[in-house]
Amino acid sequence: MKLSLENVNLNSNSGPNSFGQKLFKYMPSCGVTFENTPEPDAYLCFIESGRATHNAPLFQRLDGIYFNSSFDYTAQNSNIKRTYDMAKGVIFQSNFNKELTFKYFGPHSKYAIIHNGADLDLINSIEKIKIDKYENIWSCASSWRPHKRLKENIRYFLEHSGPNDGLIVAGNVEDKVKHERIHYVGELTTEKLFSLYKASRFFLHLAWLDHCPNVVVDALACGCQIICSSAGGTKEIAGENAIIIQEDDWDFSPIELYNPPPMDFARKHENIWNVNREYDMTSVSKKYYNFMKGTLNG
């Protein structure tokens, strides 16, 4: 299959683009070649297309839509929906993402839910960072926008960690909570993140209404126990031993995303939603290929 990627920057390490790098690495084992040719067998577009038409079937990888009531989410979604309506098939990153999109755009006739995957070859080649100062390392990593709830991550750590545990926060942070057991390391390369995850016992991701964060899949693949919110799609990929903080159900109505509610950590429980047990990119790539090939042949 000759596949042309659209709206993917293989030189960027943002969430969608880092996943694009993984597809580019692993899908050739399925018989896929990535070509910038005027006559591909199909296009795979991440999120939205800038083209009016395509000369081959279009597949959309959709990792989220806009619903923040503080912005004009209808305008923000306009081209995403246009791409959705053009697409022969749509790949959602989580059940949550599918239900959200169906609410705003309507059902799609051909879709698959394929959770994000981890580059196990790269992970297995990396040694964990040596940190002897603490009994247990906790970590978290994100682009720290308000709904990622860094301060809730920190509060959970301070309330549940042992006196000899340390928290390492990756990503740029402007409003830092100062504490002798909390360390801010800024933006890290993928390799350094994996090295940190491999040294961590716990990975905190208490983001509100997140779709299917790559950092959680990567941290799980590195051996971390995940602690996350029930709100959104993260719980689907957090693993069977994840700790879930229960939050109120959301009916998908527009909401102030950057004004998340405080969390009640007493509402924690085991993960009853975990549905993703094949998070290595070899399996994920095969799912992408099988969905696109089956749709083209159907």
Predicted regions: what is each one?
Residues 96, 117:
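Carbohydrate-associated surface elements
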Residues 171-194:
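Nucleotide-activated donor-binding/catalytic signature segment of Leloir-type glycosyltransferases, i.e.
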Residues 130-148, 154-159, 167:
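Conserved donor-binding/catalytic core segment of Leloir-type glycosyltransferases
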Residues 84, 195-200:
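Short alpha-helical donor nucleotide-sugar binding micro-motif in glycosyltransferases
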Residues 208:
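Aromatic "clamp/platform" in nucleotide-sugar-dependent glycosyltransferases that forms part
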Residues 225-228, 235:
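Short hydrophobic beta-strand element within catalytic cores of glycosyltransferases
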